[in-house]
């Protein structure tokens, strides 16, 4: 079959059809966009413009043929004869008017990254200080355990004050109007003295620069003295590591002598909450979902965090799976549940996401009742979709994802003063 045989296509739209035909001939449609579906509709996301169009049944059929690499270009033309002629005409008009399927070809890779390395005006955005390698916990899924080869093991080194000050002074001189300072460990509160010194030095030398501070803590070393000090630090954000109720938390988060940590962690978080009483509490929670991943366990963990009424209702509870290769028994558990349709989503085993989506559908998303393990995951994804780049002129828009220009976005300083 030839394009000229399709009488339902006006002459003015045949160049559009020819472009689709050529695309099908080379099976290059997959780089132009993505087909996806919800319970109510089928959609097409256009890579070049960021636009999303709703597909009726006829256009959905045409697009499925277009995107199927096992079907020929002739089959694509034949598909146009099997639907309402007006649907074909309207589809081609939409593609032409919205400038769909016109993403520019990728002719080079990494030019903007290479250029950034030689730019003498680079301004670092975040400096991460490894204030200590020490940790008083030995969480069974920790990426720094001796059983995981991807990172260093736990050490005993602490960052000296002179290294911290030198790093901070450099960052203050080589950053823009805003600088993020992050304290990292180990457990950062093991070297709270240095954290406090860095905060006070950076505040004294910041000038008009805005500084944002952050750190993640297991909360076990939190005292009223520390909490009172932290509560008066401007632009400070804290992430508390707590996995859920006692039985869930203590199953994997233990001290070096294998003793449980729940009481000390939740007690430290309560002390911090008391210090912020009557004011905004910039503290969120990070939980790790350990085996088993069943819906019953997710309900248990969710109910626990919802019950902590001494925390702000808007407290962000982030929950993730353990890093690959870190959690004992994780591979065996995945082998057991993989293939179970109860936990399958888009061809992948993902019980957490399935539960989160169902919970959002049944209970809704209420910003004033967000202290749970589904609100922020779903809401943040929706925000990303809503704030995506949408343009009329098709463009590549951005460089390679995951590629960092050294010293531009963030800089990690080890306890011994090495840059990473």
Where are these regions (language model features)?
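Conserved alpha-helical substructure of the radical SAM core
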Residues: 83-90, 94, 108-228, 233-236
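Auxiliary Fe-S-binding modules of radical SAM enzymes
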Residues: 1-49, 55-71, 78, 327-335, ...
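Radical SAM enzyme [4Fe-4S]-AdoMet core and its adjacent flexible, acidic
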Residues: 247, 252-266, 270-402, 412
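A cross-domain feature marking catalytic cores of carbohydrate-active enzymes
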Residues: 185, 215-219, 240-242, 285-289, ...
